[in-house]
């Protein structure tokens, strides 16, 4: 039995008083003080971990102003505040103690657009890709690019002055910020924009906080103009935080306070809104993917690409390429980056040309390709091949792979993981190759592996050395390397922070700015935040206050993780290896990962949040001397003793009375998971939440009773076959209003599905496919076996959507094969989802033995529901290991593709069909939609893939009363719009859950693709 974890780091009373008074004064946002909420805000995409005291989620600038006014009260003068948005920072920029002010949950509105003048006004929580999706119909985009664009917010980009691919042409975020609305500590609203110097000087004479700010910045930047110009490096990625260089224009006629706030990392004010310059979308985009025999060759050849007038040159090393090959993303780009025969591709330059003149762009591309061919023939520059990508869809897929590179590095095998701490250094591009050669020599001298990729045109390369932060010696080495890289970048006239901001690296600021200029930064900080209450420890302390700075060797996630025994860390790898990349925060409703995060906007309900909580839970167990691996081994095979039952009843009673246990917070996070498994493939690190969720639930319920609904779900495969013998009787009973009311109130289940009428057995009575014995199958000759297909049943389709199975059997017959319906054998997936892992292992072993026996017959086995079929491949393998055997159950599309391989493609005509894939299917098997389309094409039918996210049903998730609202909300995110837009009778869904959700919400259902094929053939 797991122990009660009764104590978690508490919240000081002053913070609680502040939050209470905040709500009393009309704060309309959310506040959170639970340990789980604070833990999810204690990390970002960096190696650091710092626990805040509380989190607030304002809904408007007025809410932020209320926070700032109340904070200025003397009784709360000791509290500190840190703005936060996407949480994708790689250097702890938004990590701090005190109160976190999170803009991402509610402040995500696009307020206004002016296409004629080319600008847009947004709130700080708007995500970069969200904005570009909105701008696309107007023919615009927000130009600064970054790899985390589908979850990084504009507020975060502004606060770190972010930039990435294309910055040589488009510049940094600050180059596109026309003005901001910022809330100062005290509640004053500061609106910035470029001003004539005379007006700025006049504003500085006002005896107000804003007047003091204008006066300080104006006077310091004017008086120290020459010092600033002399000390700021002449780089595309100029020195940020605070950008003293660009406050005045070159002619000294214009003053813009915006440039001080961009890159300020929340140390000066709360930026709540911004007016942004937007750029016309280029009409033509081309990529030339240039392949090299070494990474050094790729680096040294980059200036040649820039000279060819390319928009950007991105580079990727062999380590990143090889990790991409192992990821789901490679499926989408493999044809665009093919291997060169008899050559090893160890480096890649992705060269983009863009513009409005197609003839001119193609001329430049062709000229480059001619030069590349000359280099290949003469064996110069290490060029071994190239490919041109002319289609926009292909261009976007290549960049999606490149964007995923940073996350893929975290999936490197072993305890040492490539980590960010010196990953955005910038040097003049002409020195980049030599600089990287020395950088690599430094890492090689310590025997470290590393991955490299980046923006070689701008002189920025992302270098992530592999270190084990659970090893104290490697943590020391990380600081040593960091110091060495500071010296190395200075040697080449570069910067340590080229695009990701400073964060915990601000301790190096004096070395880059110089003491005299650093003192000027402190004066600016003092004008905005004299008492050091906004994100203290970052950028610089205010003048006149001897405050410490955050350090590179501050407390890290590894500091906590190393308290967990190595064996436990290894066995719970799925939770331990989350590196915080945050891809699970992807805003796009059509992305399968992560539906619970999308609907709640609560990061507790994301793979990263769940992994964070489980890691802390494991640490707290270790702190109490409890070994979860031993507990798992000691679990009884079946049943529990009366003594244990009494103890669980008592513990559950106390829990219902409000007794605290951190395990309850973890349980709450796990209960929101749909177990769709999208994270297990979509996450670059392959964080498999359903797997460690099941293990947690199994251990949690050693202490607490399981709800009745869990037992009902776990035993569905036992009672469904019995109920299917009299489906009308049971449906009548289930349909009674009283039964449904009792089910919702006392069991916690709603909208219970009805059994199929007639049942599958009734439909197939007397049919040869349902009456073949094992002996009859074994007696078939080789030719007969080659034409026989064994259909594997699953509990949901066979008993609740039997027509699909019956139609598949008929389809198999129509295609000239003999279908055989195998006896039903429980799959066990429902047991796995609810954490009945011992019971699941028994079920899996029994069914695996049966299917292995069938496999020996040498006939293909096929199942129709993707989630259940894929369970045989994934969960069975984890539960049984080698005992699983070698059997293989094919999906319907896999078998059809093979069976129809020799059939020619017919002329496609008629109305299109529309394919809606199951989350588990399309993430585990990304080629499934195309495979289905190819199958339809063989019969002259067109099948279009519809890009949607999760439907919200996910097995029994949508039938649980506590999930009902979220289930319907998830459906509304993407499925409902698609169903309203398309003809229902032409929509097809492979998942039983998906079809049942459509029927529940829309009133009429959709069919399985095999049913449409049967109709087409008829």
Description of each model-found segment:
Residues 88-90, 148-155, 239-247, 314-331, ...:
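A glycine-rich phosphate-binding loop feature that marks nucleotide/adenosyl-phosphate handling sites
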Residues 274, 308-415, 454, 599-600, ...:
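Terminal amphipathic helices with adjacent charged low-complexity linkers/tails
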Residues 529, 536, 690-1018:
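Iron-sulfur cluster-binding electron-transfer modules in prokaryotic oxidoreductases
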Residues 2-5, 203-248, 254, 524, ...:
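Flexible inter-domain linker/hinge segments
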Residues 548-581, 585-723, 841-847, 885, ...:
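Ferredoxin-type iron-sulfur electron-transfer modules in oxidoreductases and energy-metabolism complexes
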Residues 1-72, 76, 86-118, 147, ...:
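N-terminal flexible segment immediately upstream of the FAD-binding catalytic core
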């Amino acid at each position: 039995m797991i122990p009660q974890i009764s104590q978690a780091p508490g919240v000081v009373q002053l913070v609680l008083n502040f939050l209470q008074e905040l709500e009393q004064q009309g704060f309309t946002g959310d506040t959170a003080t639970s340990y789980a909420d604070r833990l999810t805000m204690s990390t970002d995409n960096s190696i650091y971990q710092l626990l805040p005291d509380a989190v607030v989620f304002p809904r408007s600038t007025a809410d932020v102003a209320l926070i700032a006014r109340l904070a200025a009260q003397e009784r709360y003068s000791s509290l500190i505040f840190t703005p936060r948005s996407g949480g994708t920072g790689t250097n702890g920029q938004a990590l701090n103690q005190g109160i976190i002010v999170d803009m991402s949950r509610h402040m995500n509105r696009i307020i206004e657009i002016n296409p004629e003048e080319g600008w847009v006004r947004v709130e700080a929580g708007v995500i970069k890709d969200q904005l570009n999706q909105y701008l696309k119909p107007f023919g615009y985009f927000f130009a600064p690019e970054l790899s985390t664009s589908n979850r990084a917010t504009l507020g975060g980009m502004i606060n770190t002055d972010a930039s990435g691919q294309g910055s040589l042409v488009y510049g940094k975020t600050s180059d596109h910020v026309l003005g901001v609305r910022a809330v100062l500590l005290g509640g004053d609203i500061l609106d910035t924009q470029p001003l004539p110097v005379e007006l700025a000087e006049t504003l500085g004479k006002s005896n107000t906080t804003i007047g003091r700010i204008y006066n300080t910045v104006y006077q310091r930047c004017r008086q120290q103009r020459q010092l600033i110009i002399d000390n700021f490096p002449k780089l595309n990625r100029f020195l940020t935080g605070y950008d003293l260089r660009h406050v005045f224009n070159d002619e000294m006629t214009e003053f813009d306070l915006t440039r001080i706030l961009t890159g300020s990392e929340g140390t000066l004010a709360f930026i709540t809104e911004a007016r942004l310059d937007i750029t016309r979308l280029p009409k033509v985009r081309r990529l030339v993917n240039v392949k090299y025999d070494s990474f050094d060759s790729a680096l040294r050849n980059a200036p040649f690409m820039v000279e060819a007038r390319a928009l950007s040159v991105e580079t990727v090393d062999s380590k990143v390429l090889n990790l991409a090959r192992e990821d789901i993303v490679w499926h989408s780009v493999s044809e665009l980056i093919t291997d060169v025969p008899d050559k090893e591709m160890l480096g890649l330059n992705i060269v983009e040309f863009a513009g409005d003149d197609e003839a001119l762009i193609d001329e430049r591309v062709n000229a480059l390709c001619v030069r590349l061919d000359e280099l290949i023939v003469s064996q110069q520059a290490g060029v071994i091949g190239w490919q041109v990508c002319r289609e926009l869809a292909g261009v976007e897929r290549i960049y999606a792979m490149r964007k995923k590179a940073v996350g893929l590095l975290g999936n490197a095998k072993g305890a040492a993981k490539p980590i960010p701490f010196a990953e955005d250094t910038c040097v003049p591009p002409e020195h980049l190759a030599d600089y990287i050669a020395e950088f690599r020599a430094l890492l090689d001298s310590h025997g470290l592996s590393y991955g490299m990729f980046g923006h070689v045109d701008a002189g920025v390369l992302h270098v992530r050395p592999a270190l084990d932060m659970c090893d104290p010696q490697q943590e020391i080495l990380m600081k040593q390397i960091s110091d060495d890289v500071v010296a190395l970048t200075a040697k080449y006239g570069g910067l340590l922070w080229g695009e990701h901001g400073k964060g915990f690296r601000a301790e190096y600021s004096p070395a880059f700015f110089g003491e005299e200029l650093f003192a000027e930064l402190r004066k600016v900080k003092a004008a905005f935040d004299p008492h050091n209450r906004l994100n203290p420890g970052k950028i610089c302390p205010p003048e006149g206050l001897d405050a410490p700075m955050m350090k590179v060797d501050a407390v890290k996630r590894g500091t906590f993780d190393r308290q967990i025994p190595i064996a436990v860390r290894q066995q719970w790898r799925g939770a331990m290896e989350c590196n915080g990349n945050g891809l699970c925060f992807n805003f796009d409703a059509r992305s399968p990962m992560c539906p619970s995060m999308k609907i709640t906007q609560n990061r507790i309900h994301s793979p990263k949040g769940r992994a964070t909580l489980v890691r802390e839970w494991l640490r707290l167990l270790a702190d109490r001397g409890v070994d979860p691996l031993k507990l798992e081994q000691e679990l009884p095979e079946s049943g529990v003793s009366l003594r244990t039952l009494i103890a669980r009843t008592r513990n559950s009673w106390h829990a219902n009375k409000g007794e605290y246990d951190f395990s309850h917070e973890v349980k709450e996070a796990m209960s929101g998971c749909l177990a769709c498994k999208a994270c297990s493939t979509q996450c670059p690190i392959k964080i498999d939440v359903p797997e460690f969720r099941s293990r947690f639930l199994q251990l949690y319920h050693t202490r607490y009773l399981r709800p009745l609904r869990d037992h009902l779900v776990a035993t569905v495969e036992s009672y469904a076959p019995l109920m299917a013998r009299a489906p009308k009787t049971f449906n009548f009973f289930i349909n009674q209003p009283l039964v449904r009311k009792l089910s919702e109130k006392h069991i916690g289940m709603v909208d219970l599905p009805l059994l199929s009428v007639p049942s599958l057995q009734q439909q197939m009575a007397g049919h040869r496919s349902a009456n073949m014995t094992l002996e009859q199958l074994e007696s078939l000759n080789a030719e007969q076996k080659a034409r026989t297909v064994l259909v594997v049943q699953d509990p949901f389709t066979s008993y609740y959507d039997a027509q699909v199975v019956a139609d598949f059997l008929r389809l198999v017959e129509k295609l000239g094969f003999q279908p055989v319906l195998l006896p039903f054998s429980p799959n066990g997936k429902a047991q796995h989802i609810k954490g009945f892992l011992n019971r699941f292992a028994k079920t899996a072993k029994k069914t695996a033995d049966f299917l292995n026996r069938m496999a020996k017959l040498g006939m293909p086995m096929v199942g129709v529901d993707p989630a259940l079929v894929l369970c045989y491949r994934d969960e069975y393998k984890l539960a049984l290991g080698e005992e699983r055997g070698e059997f293989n159950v094919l999906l319907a599309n896999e078998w059809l593709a093979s069976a129809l391989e020799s059939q020619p493609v017919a002329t496609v005509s008629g109305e299109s069909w529309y394919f809606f894939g199951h989350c588990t299917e399309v993430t585990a098997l990304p080629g499934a939609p195309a495979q289905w389309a190819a199958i339809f094409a063989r019969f002259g039918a067109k099948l279009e893939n519809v890009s949607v996210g999760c439907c919200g049903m996910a097995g029994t998730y949508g039938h649980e009363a506590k999930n009902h609202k979220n289930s319907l909300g998830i459906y509304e995110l993407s499925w409902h719009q698609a169903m309203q837009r398309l003809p229902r009778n032409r929509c097809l869904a492979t998942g039983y859950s998906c079809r049942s959700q459509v029927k529940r919400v829309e009133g009429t259902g959709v069919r399985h693709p095999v049913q449409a094929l049967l109709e087409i053939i008829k």
